[in-house]
């Protein structure tokens, strides 16, 4: 290997500087330099260097060659021009050339001497021989011939020739042999290592160099590669500033996870020693961490340095999803090196350079589409890894960009190696970024350093990059899509090779996008606090209204429980509003933005949102069950206004005679009204099956589910061969909720505007049926509050034939009879009622007798059967409620009034029915609140939340649709069945007639 020019002068300067002085200098001035410098520089490639320039593999830029020199074949060094011989060569461009005399225009193959050629010269100015001839330039002992002949190689001074590996020519021996021993032999006390010869003194401090390869617990071993090449690479880098050796030393440090321990002199320890003792050399591109001749491996080891690197300088490139200036491509490039430190090439990361999992090129390249969250996981056989990666390739990753003057630059991409140990501590696994040590160079697979004793055998251990994550952080408050330098987080795993054909390893590659969501969290907390406070007030008002409706002024345990139930419902609405609002915000602003200003929360940040959705569902379920229980326990009674039409003769059993009796009133009208009431108990303003199927159609068939993908596209369709990004829980919830609400609201509007008006309105039809049947409905949803449907026929009776019925309808249509309202000359048939305690007590006394048919027989009169007692109680209740409506009981009278607007808004009554009950005119059919019909908002939101919770848990819209419809039918069945039993119990209608 060769040496760098001026090495002797550099070593003289370095010897004057102590390690402590250098360290103090760095600690004093490095923070100031860091604040002033940037980590970007011009992007240059080897093929763009001029013929008289070479590509400096350390500085990654084109550097001029010396006099009488040109670029070599690889472009990374210099050679003499044709007709010039080398008189000095220490590696790289540091060579000296001298023109050959006229009588010896040819140059030897090694370029060190001039020679007379027996025939023509090649383009390189060397002798040319016919096919089948061997060019011999020196005699057998190495003496240069005036004309090419075959001679023995001469290893003495002035020749220093040895036989090459192929044995077909004599070549000059390795320069370190000449410099160290002035011969081609490396005899004691000199040290022969890695094919190089070094002096036994003056290279490194007298400390034992460790060839240990650090790994996971219990996986450390002595690497044959380190044992063979570590010392030689370090010595060549230190003594001769050899660029390739310095790169090879850096590679060994990277293979050792960039870990170093002050107690040992391992690969990174040697690198740090050279770095600290070359402080007198200039930096590369004004980057203080990048020393001339050395690779850039570290960002320094000062606490708090990592956050500055990651957030001090933003990329001037603007990223946008849409518009004329659309820019959604992250242009990553990498300088690649082989294990021996040779520069291979510049290459883009497209095509799966850093992705071990195989896939199509389109899907692999999707990882670098800005705004697309990327996840790739697979399991790879160890045997395939050993075949595909016999030696590691090392990458220095950069992000390419163009400034405002259209000049190309590259920005260094820092690396967070989770396996890095600093003094045996995994500092990069700490949650505090201030303790991180950022690095630069990475590799994917190392199957070399894990070989023991022989490099030709199968490795005992291989090291694989099992987790690679590229995170892009958006600059806060940006409106132009500016980002900070991306961060590569990488984790390696050591695999102990036992049977390569049966072993495998799981690997993953991901790209995530982050932004500071602190402000969003604060705003969410503020909204939750404000709306939660309003929910408390609303719940207090509902509780106060409930207390009035049950006629109890005392605050007891039941009151507290009721308040908590009301608060659960209101708080569910708060969580629902916040989650839907948050979801729609991210859906609209992320998918519709042009210049990028917001990025989606990461999955771990979505946990809080999912918790809110879960709370909304749990609380809404409690509210739904509370309403369900309230509906199936209401008091209801059908008041039959029909009166007997006359008397008939009736035989008296046991007396052998007859007597006159009133004509009994038919019960069929009551049964009919009861059946209609039973049918409308679960009538809704939407069609549940249509709702579920329509939502599913838009999600799965139309493709609205694609809006929930974590990418920048707002298209409803995706190309199957292309990469499909993972779903965002927030976007998935937002799309589902928006569709469910939109379709539900459309159904409700259609139901109210068209269906009820032109086709069928079951609620109003029920009120009309009551009038035609001459039956009123008395409902008590609370102890002292309920509803009254006035169904008293304006014709006096309803138990008639078809002809008379049609005649009555005709008279009513022609306004030839009075109006149906409770108050004369009005149409008001529905009322909200607040009854007095005295009225309720009287009702309860009769009702207690009515329900005694379910009690023990010993409590009943011995002279009457249970059935007769119930019939008697039924007629008593019918008579009492009829007389109450007719103002017969002055001590239990009532008056009719309109509700105040504020009373309607607050849902409570300001007046207490102390002596008289109060009937409030109700044109809105409020009695539907004891039915499904009047609670559509609660049912719609409950179904929506159920659908979303199932989907978030299973990530399956089809399953969520099926389970949602199933629960709707289950609760509908429960409501029908239990409500029917309650109706039969409270009205004495035999359940067998409720069909």
UniProtKB/Swiss-Prot annotation:
The keyword Transmembrane helix applies. The chain crosses the membrane at residues 520-548, 559-590, 604-631, 671-701, 732-771, 927-952, 958-985. Changing residue 786 to E: In MKS3; decreased function in non-canonical Wnt signaling activation; when expressed in TMEM67-null cells does not induce ROR2 phosphorylation upon stimulation by WNT5A. Residues 37-280 are annotated as: Cysteine-rich. Widely expressed in adult and fetal tissues. Expressed at higher level in spinal cord. Disulfide bonds join 49-62, 65-78, 80-97, 100-114, 117-127, 129-150, 153-170, 173-184, 186-197, 237-246, 253-268, 357-378. Keywords: Bardet-Biedl syndrome, Cell membrane, Cell projection, Ciliopathy, Cilium, Cilium biogenesis/degradation, Coiled coil, Cytoplasm, Cytoskeleton, Deafness, Disease variant, Disulfide bond, Endoplasmic reticulum, Glycoprotein, Intellectual disability, Joubert syndrome, Meckel syndrome, Membrane, Nephronophthisis, Obesity, Retinitis pigmentosa, Signal, Transmembrane, Transmembrane helix. Changing residue 132 to A: In COACH1; does not affect protein abundance; fails to rescue the hydrocephalus phenotype in a zebrafish model. Changing residue 358 to L: In COACH1 and JBTS6; found in a patient with Joubert syndrome that also carries mutation 1329-R--S-1332 Del in KIF7. Changing residue 301 to E: Found in Joubert syndrome-related disorder; likely pathogenic. Changing residue 296 to C: In MKS3; uncertain significance. It is found in: Cell membrane; Endoplasmic reticulum membrane; Cell projection, Cilium; Cytoplasm, Cytoskeleton, Cilium basal body. It is linked to TMEM67 mutations result in ciliary dysfunction leading to a broad spectrum of disorders, collectively termed ciliopathies. Overlapping clinical features include retinal degeneration, renal cystic disease, skeletal abnormalities, fibrosis of various organ, and a complex range of anatomical and functional defects of the central and peripheral nervous system. The ciliopathy range of diseases includes Meckel-Gruber syndrome, Bardet-Biedl syndrome, Joubert syndrome, and nephronophtisis among others. This is Meckelin.
